[in-house]
């Protein structure tokens, strides 16, 4: 069991896309991908593929992303 064995590759890919959207100031795309991330977390939790610490970590990630997006102003 590795140091980050709780990580889920699919969720990490979606989270990475959200980060890219935020860095590029693509607020609409970031919000869509945050929703996708939440839905995927819920689906994996319901199927038993995501448990315990991982659920909390990914939910915290979603909360952080939402806070960043809500505090970001469009620059165009």
Outline where the language-model segments fall.
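N-terminal acidic leader/helix
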Residues: 1-32, 70
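Alpha-helical linker/edge segments of TPR/alpha-solenoid repeat scaffolds
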Residues: 58-76
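Short, charge-rich amphipathic alpha-helical segments embedded
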Residues: 35-58
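Charged, amphipathic alpha-helical oligomerization/scaffolding segments
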Residues: 10-13, 17, 36, 57-64
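Secondary-structure edge/capping motif, primarily at the C-terminal ends of alpha-helices
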Residues: 18-25, 41-48, 72, 76
